Amino acid sequence: MYSVNGNCFRISVRNLVEFMCAEGDIDNRNTGSNDVKIMQEGARIHRKIQHSMGTMYHAEVPLKIEIPLVSDLGIEYVLQVEGRADGIIADINYDEDGNKEPESDAIIDEIKTMQTDVSLLKEPVYVHKAQALVYGYIYASQKKLSKIGIQMTYVTPEPETINKFLEEYTFERIEEWFNKLITGFKRWTDYTFDERHKRTESIRELKFPYEYREGQKNLCVSVYRAIEDNTNLYIQAPTGVGKTLSTVFPAVQALGQQMSDKIFYLTSKTIT
């Protein structure tokens, strides 16, 4: 879904809009499918449409934006949003009178395959359109465009049916929409970094709860160094030496030093 590396919160465009813009419906035929055959058919149709659009159509365009933010506790971090636009029409055709068709500096094309009859759609599914809008904002801001077209291309595989929706946005309008999206999502990213900060401060104050047994401190040091060096450590120690605490405690300390983000402690059912 997302990843946090240091002070960078990284999320894909699709995961961002699905988290922020998804609307409830028990009918998931309009929101995609995990069926392998359907996904393969959708990929084939994507390629077919992309190849039919000519030289002006740029397929699978990678886009990324980094947004500097500050949490409620004053933690500075970067929100990185990235993904691939299905298509971008960067050069627009001109009609006989020399006018652009349509009047946009570029068009973002988002292609969605559905199992329902797309000809019955009256408007784009909002979460799909939101994905295209994010791509549109990133592209328009980086290319300094005054306006951009957002096109949703819906396809039903059998019988093959295509339904398109095209809407033009000024940069000010799409920027306002994007800023509202990020402001809403910032609540969650702020929480992530603020809680990490609280956790780190708590770990730094943590002391080993007992007096070290014989060999226990050396074991803690070995585990910590293995985590620090990102290496495996194999330990053979007698029962009663305190292996559980001697491995978990240095792992928690390493967590406080941001050497890792999570701890997984796996053990057998009856012994540790």
Where are these regions (language model features)?
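Walker A/P-loop
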Residues: 228-250, 262-263
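Post-Walker A helix-loop "phosphate-sensing" segment adjacent to the P-loop in P-loop NTPases
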Residues: 254-260
